[in-house]
Amino acid sequence: REQVRGGAGALESLAGRVAIIELLGLSHAELCQRAALSTPFLPTIHWITAARSTAQTRWLLMEIFQRIWLGSYPRVNEYGGEIRDIFYRSYIQTYIQRDVQDVLKVTDQLAFHRFLVAVAARTAQLLNYANLAQDVGIDNKTAKAWLSVLEASGLIFLLQPYHSNLTKRLVKTPKLYFLDTGLAAYLTKWNSAASLE
């Protein structure tokens, strides 16, 4: 329960007056300024056909790599590559020095940075705690704790597998996704959109 000071020093609860809205980076439709025209993705032939017919332009492969390299943060897309490295460097420093330090009490910030890089390098792959921990030089328990903080803070998403059998769904391995492609590219040292090619 959060409390703030009222007028005469009284404490007032914010319960019932606050909503938490999770915002991800800008979508492709938002970056193209077509968000009002877009509908949520559905994996159907009808949706794909309709989306293709309303697409304004075909993208060149290098334009797609540029979009991946920049990521989905509004400021980076507004100014482009000229501020990208400064933005992501500052973002990582702030994230590690403030948020992570407060939550995890990480004593080895270099190890945590290596962990971030290792996670970014594994985007869209099956999650393997043992390999991740071994590559960074930490134990599995620490890798799980650190990964849960990355997930809770909106840096990554764990896509749980689908299976018609609920038991199999619970024991199968999830895939790990970095939510911002620009941050993943920055951490893995892709220095330009052309380097993604």
Task: List each language-model region with its residue ranges.
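Interdomain motor-coupling "hinge/lid" segment immediately C-terminal to the ATP-binding subdomain
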Residues: 8-121, 125
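Basic, low-complexity intrinsically disordered segments
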Residues: 4, 20, 166
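Accessory nucleic acid-recognition modules appended to NTPase machines
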Residues: 77-197
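Sensor-1/coupling segment of RecA-like P-loop NTPase cores
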Residues: 1-10, 150
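A generic local structural motif
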Residues: 7-9, 54, 143, 163-164
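Conserved nucleotide-binding/hydrolysis micro-motifs of P-loop NTPases
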Residues: 2-5, 25-29, 163, 183
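A secondary-structure boundary/capping signal
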Residues: 1, 22-27, 128, 179
